[in-house]
Amino acid sequence: MRILFMGTPEFAVPSLEALVAAGHEVCGVFSQPDKPVGRHQNKLQPTPVKECALAHNIPVFQPVKMRDGTALAQIQTLAPELIVVAAYGRILPDDILTCPPKGCINVHSSLLPKYRGAAPINWAVINGDTVSGVTIMHMATELDAGDIIAQESTEIGANETAEELYRRLSILGADLLVQAVSAIEAGLAQRTPQNSEEVTLAPMLGKELSPMDWSRTAHALHCQVRGLLPWPVASTDKLTGETIKVYRTEETGGKTHAQPGTVLAAGKQGIDVACGEGTVLRITELQAPGKKRMKAADYLRGHPIAVQSQE
């Protein structure tokens, strides 16, 4: 099938690769504009999807706006039968959604209608979900509200981070996408409307989510740490006299009567901190200001922490 692909980050690369490998004619790729990088912001970094497209000699288009008619004109010239969107990062206007004869479909990294929005993987982990998945849906005017074509679920590991789940779902989504496209091409795709009563949202993440509140349970904080990777990263200024970023934690399963925020142990295994409801969280990887990410044990060699210090 003649397909126009729209995507930007690493998550979308397996989907593009899968379409090419399946023998579809990818007539073009839309990706967000290159971003300036470097100390002086004087170098342009192409998106992962752009790099993938160029490696396959696929024409790349990077419109700044989607509503000024330029993007639509480019699409009409390319004349795709279907548009496939995977983490493009732009909202498509109705005239683009209705342009290809077989419509537009999207690879969404949640089990819709749960977690509509920009950060579904992160919120699934932050909220302590044990199952996630991907959805292939027909795109509609309302964000992430279109009919479901296919879904596949996967368990979230107890210590799996959002960053790790992101990589797994990108592969799962690519495989499911190829199946869905084949069904659409054969006229066999089933469309299931979303249940509006089950909708939950996954808004963009912000730095305001980073601070750790030690009155919460160890499990809730463990989910926060895992869910805020790779950005904005959980942090605390209550333990060491400086704000540290927390990258890896463990639920010890221990119990304590100490006040939340109390450092119970600091050594080779990490930093054990009292949390809400008498639970204990162990910090095993962190980053101090101006330093690289490191094991908590390595940090402690140069920054000893007094055990039983209070919040």
Predicted regions and their residues:
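N-terminal glycine-/serine-/threonine-rich beta1-alpha1-beta2 phosphate-ribose binding loop
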Residues: P36-A79
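Acyl-group handling in specialized metabolite and lipid biosynthesis
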Residues: P203-R216
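N-terminal Rossmann-like dinucleotide-binding module
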Residues: M1-H40
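A residue-level signal for conserved active-site and pocket-lining positions in enzyme catalytic cores
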Residues: G7, V29, A53, I83, ...
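Short beta->alpha connector loops
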Residues: T8-F11, V64-R67, Y88-R90, T252
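Donor/substrate-binding cores of folate-linked one-carbon enzymes
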Residues: A22-E25, L82-L201, E208
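An anion-binding loop in the catalytic cleft
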Residues: S215-E311
